[in-house]
From Swiss-Prot:
Ca(2+) 2 binds at residues 619, 621, 623, 625, 630. GO terms for molecular function: calcium ion binding; iron ion binding; manganese ion binding; protein serine/threonine phosphatase activity. Also found in fetal brain. It comes from Homo sapiens (Human). May have a role in the recovery or adaptation response of photoreceptors. May have a role in development. The active site is at residue 234. This is Serine/threonine-protein phosphatase with EF-hands 1. Optimum pH is 8.0.
Length: 653
């Protein structure tokens, strides 16, 4: 009997162990599938983000093209607003920007006292936690005072650490004020004993960019030797037009917003472009290339880099009498080439410009070599060999950079020689990623600190968080798909030799990759985007189900509507450049002239009669003017309500 009892217990124990192993294996598989879905969603967000940045960089070639061809398209003297070509001599003095703006007694927000002290930092933090707005007078004064100090600084700040004085490196914040509050809560406020480096991209995307900028600038003015600011690719007035900071300023400072934007352009240009810690760690926003020349970058006149979208122009030194001037000091000669009013020394050389672009825009890759950053459209991809070459050349040990969202807030690559740090948590969607910062001390290994701003969604189970993130990613991907409906339909039909309305998943994926230019796992995504029949074939017109572009003018041709929707961000920037008085209005003739240039440069094939008809319809009161910004807002995507509300039964894994 004793043996029988022992045998039974053994069998039960074996059964329990097998059951535990089955559950464990199932759970591991479940977690792996969730992680795969999360990875696919992040890939969608990142691919679309980089494609938008590529479009933004392509605007630089358009602006050059526009200036070179402007007189050929439109013989009358149209006025262009080009902030980057205004000289500082044309800027009004401090009185016009700061002292002429009174702070009324009725203002209940924070009142700063210059010269600033740590009390002002505390005052500002408490006010912003209460969602108060800093008066425009103080915003302008802070920017003026910060610019004054920045102008005295070198291109690269050199700092030293010690066992009793670590330095904290923060990456992109992108207007995420709660992340900055959390960093200061966990790590302490900036001080002589607690120095910080903020590695660019303070602004854009998030809704509190001006608050972050004011906290950083005030802290910098109080501790100029202990808080260090590096320029990122979003510290650029042209980037701000697309990614939200310009709109934030104009919304919060309706009366004085334009003045703030003008000063910001100069402020950005004077930001240092890098920091070197203990003579061995290079801290820059983007990365390097095989031709990165730190000696040149130490010497370059950084304030000449107003915007990455305004590349160096061809300076014609001949005194051509047959020339045409516009409002901003640009001269077109008889051949349509650009001349600038002033000496060539007022502008960066092309080589200098490319050097700065590389350190602001480049990304590391695992593959050796250096090749164009085709995803972003600017900078390059650099491999481990390039990292070793540049670090060895300048006797450095490590490169710390930001510029890329990472799921854990940081990433180490290139045999530990390159570290990416990203400080904006929940960047794409609630729960999408952690933020992180680094603490450095001479002779020790970098220490990483992770965090995540917690809101209601962050307390949800992982499955629900992944569902939310996945649904959001698929939604923006569908919006990209519908903007190319005509092109995709033609591509599908070319593959559909039997005219069946169906393609193999491989054929469908080939069309999506080819037309949209997004490097995504289309086969894996197919179950979320299209209907697949029992034989595994894609009903390709279902790519456009449950979504449409709402068009404000019903008479407009669908191809024109798709084109306007697809390029709406680019067009908004271009037409804001024409709107010299910020009225929001442009003339019908300006619209037609600039559309010709735009369609020619972007190879957009739209019949002129459609554009002329649309221009006339847009001129609602027939006064010859178009409220173009309002018109563009009218083009938006409508998702079918039921589709957004029903629970998601498919997944990306």
């Amino acid at each position: 009997m004793g043996c029988s009892s022992s045998s039974t217990k053994t069998r039960r124990s074996d059964t329990s162990l097998r059951a535990a192993l089955i559950i464990q294996n199932w759970y591991r598989g479940y977690k792996a599938r969730l992680k795969a879905r999360q990875h696919y969603a992040l890939t969608i967000f990142q691919s679309i983000e980089y494609a938008d940045e590529q479009g933004q960089m392509q605007l630089s070639t358009f602006f050059s093209f526009m200036l070179e061809n402007y007189t050929h398209i439109h013989k009358e003297e149209l006025e262009l607003r080009n902030q980057s070509l205004e000289s500082e001599q044309d800027m009004r003095d401090r009185w016009d920007y700061v002292d002429s703006i009174d702070v009324p007694d009725s203002y209940n927000g924070p009142r700063l006292q210059f010269p600033l002290t740590c009390t002002d930092i505390d005052l500002l933090l408490e006010a912003f936690k209460e969602q108060q707005i800093l008066h425009a007078h103080y915003v302008l004064e802070v920017l003026f005072e910060t610019k004054k100090v920045l102008k005295q600084m070198p291109n690269f700040t050199h700092i030293q650490t010690s066992p009793s004085k670590e330095v904290t490196i923060c990456g992109d914040l992108h207007g995420k004020l709660d992340d900055l509050f959390l960093i200061f809560y966990k790590n302490g406020l900036p001080s002589e004993r607690n120095p910080y480096v903020f590695n660019g991209d303070f602004v854009d995307r998030g809704k509190n960019s001006i608050e972050i900028l004011m906290i950083l600038c005030v802290s910098f003015l109080v501790y100029p030797n202990d808080l260090h600011l590096n320029r990122g690719n979003h510290e650029d007035f042209m980037m701000n037009l697309r990614y939200g900071f310009t709109k934030e300023i104009l919304h919060k400072y309706k009366l004085h917003g334009k003045r703030i934007l003008q000063i910001l352009e100069e402020f950005y240009a004077w930001l240092p472009i890098g920091t070197i810690v203990d003579n061995e760690i290079l801290v820059i926003h983007g990365g390097i290339s095989e031709t990165t020349d730190l000696n040149l970058l130490h010497r370059v006149e950084r304030n000449k880099m107003k915007s990455v979208l305004i590349p160096p122009t061809e300076t014609n030194r001949d005194h051509d009498t047959d020339s045409k001037h516009n409002k901003v000091g640009v001269t077109f000669n008889a051949h349509g080439r650009i001349k600038t009013n002033g000496s060539p020394t007022e502008h960066l050389t092309e080589h200098e410009w490319e050097q700065i672009i590389d350190i602001l825009w480049s990304d590391p890759r695992g593959k050796n070599g250096c090749f164009p950053n085709t995803c972003r459209g600017g900078g390059c991809y650099f491999g481990p060999d390039v990292t070793s070459k540049i670090l060895n050349k300048y006797q450095l040990k490590m490169l710390i950079r930001s510029h890329e969202c990472k799921p854990e807030g940081y990433e180490i690559c290139h045999d530990g020689k390159v570290v990416t740090i990203f400080s904006a948590s929940n960047y794409y969607e609630e729960g999408s990623n952690r933020g992180a910062y680094i603490k450095l001390c001479s002779g020790t290994t970098p220490r990483f600190f992770q965090y995540q701003v917690t809101k209601a969604t962050c307390f949800q189970p992982l499955r629900q968080r992944v569902d939310t993130m996945e649904n959001s990613a698929i939604k923006i991907l569908r919006e990209r798909v519908i903007s190319r409906k005509s092109d995709l339909t033609r591509a599908f039909q070319l593959q559909d030799h039997r005219k069946s309305g169906k393609l193999s998943v491989s054929q469908w994926a080939f069309c999506m990759e080819n037309i949209l230019g997004l490097n995504l796992p289309w086969r894996s995504l197919s179950s979320n985007l299209v209907n697949i029949d029992q034989n595994g074939n894609v009903e390709y017109m279902s790519s456009f189900q449950n979504i449409r572009i709402e068009k404000p003018v019903q008479e407009a041709h669908s191809t024109l509507v798709e084109t306007l929707y697809r390029y709406r961000s680019d067009l908004e920037i271009i037409f804001n450049a024409i709107d010299t008085d910020h009225s929001g209005l442009i003339s019908v003739e300006e619209f037609r002239a600039m559309w010709k240039l735009f369609s020619s440069h972007y190879n957009v094939h739209i019949d002129d009669s459609q554009v002329n008809k649309l221009a006339n319809i847009m001129d609602l009161n027939k006064d010859g003017s178009i409220d173009f910004n309002e018109f563009l807002k009218a083009f938006y995507v409508v998702h079918r309500y039921e589709d957004l509300m029903k629970p998601d039964v498919t997944n990306l894994g």
